[in-house]
A protein has these predicted regions:
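PRPP-associated nucleotide enzymes
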Residues: 3-156
């Protein structure tokens, strides 16, 4: 994935946009591997409440600082599940007139998709399991695990 992204963005002015909090570890690893000229920015957007399912309501709690007009934007997300959050986000970002807008996800759950959106770059396609670790959490916990694992849902 890293090599393909570097090739796709060679010679371009790129904004690498991290979606907080879950994508931080993936974002850090990805940014170190990319060989193109880039700036980093951060956004916090969520459709999850305190549980494991989307609330259906997308909320921005921290907007990005950089202008993306005429720039190539790569959204870095931990996981694409229903797609509602990223669909909402891409619609917002398109109004800011970027030169291009693409999505890189560490994990993709296509069987959970509720809207017509797909990532441009995917680390791993996974089944419909609730996963934690490497930035992914359950109620704010387990983000620091150095791996991705399936959470036992019996107690959830």
């Amino acid at each position: 994935m890293y090599k393909r992204q570097s090739e796709d963005y060679a010679g371009k002015d790129v904004v690498l946009l991290c979606i907080l909090k879950g994508a931080v570890q993936f974002f850090s690893d990805l940014s170190r591997q990319m060989t193109c000229n880039l700036e980093m920015d951060f956004m916090s957007i969520s459709s999850y409440g305190n549980g494991t399912r989307t609330s259906g309501i997308v909320r921005i709690s921290k907007d990005m600082d950089l202008s993306i007009t005429g720039r190539h934007v790569l959204i870095v997300e931990d996981i694409m599940d229903s797609g509602l959050t990223l669909n909402h986000l891409t619609n917002i970002l398109k109004t800011r007139q970027p030169a291009s807008l693409r999505i890189a996800c560490l994990l993709d759950k296509p069987e959970r998709r509720e809207c017509a959106i797909s990532p441009n770059y995917v680390g791993f396609v996974i089944p419909n399991e609730f996963v934690i670790g490497y930035g992914l959490d359950y109620m704010g916990h387990f983000r620091n695990l150095p791996y991705v694992g399936v959470k036992n849902t019996d107690n959830m």
